[in-house]
Amino acid sequence: MRYLSILGALAMGAMIFVSSQAIAGQDGMKMHGTDSTVTGRVVDPACYIAMDLKGAAHKECAQKCAKAGQAFGILDETNGILYQVLEGSPMADPNALLMDHAEEVVTVKGMVFEKNGMKAIVPKEVTKGS
């Protein structure tokens, strides 16, 4: 029960963050990020943060959570940085480019943002990583 509460809180926080980005875009405000390339594992951030779940054994669960609305994260396993995946336009699916790569290592080209210690990326191009 405690884990469900934690997962619910993480999911709600991610949805609020994504919604705030969508609203900013609707008001004609320009997003200010840096075009970057990130290589890392596509993870379900709620399960990774709360229960340290990742890898091939967690692929099906991660895909189910993504289909239910949880945005993926990109975990840079070389330095431990987790990038929350965002979408750059309102009502778009942030997981669209990543669904086939759940729990795999990919290279993502996109716009990276950092605020108050949190990092996020809006993917523009995804290729299978090494």
List each model region and its residues.
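Structural detector for short beta-strands of small beta-barrel domains
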Residues: 34-68, 110
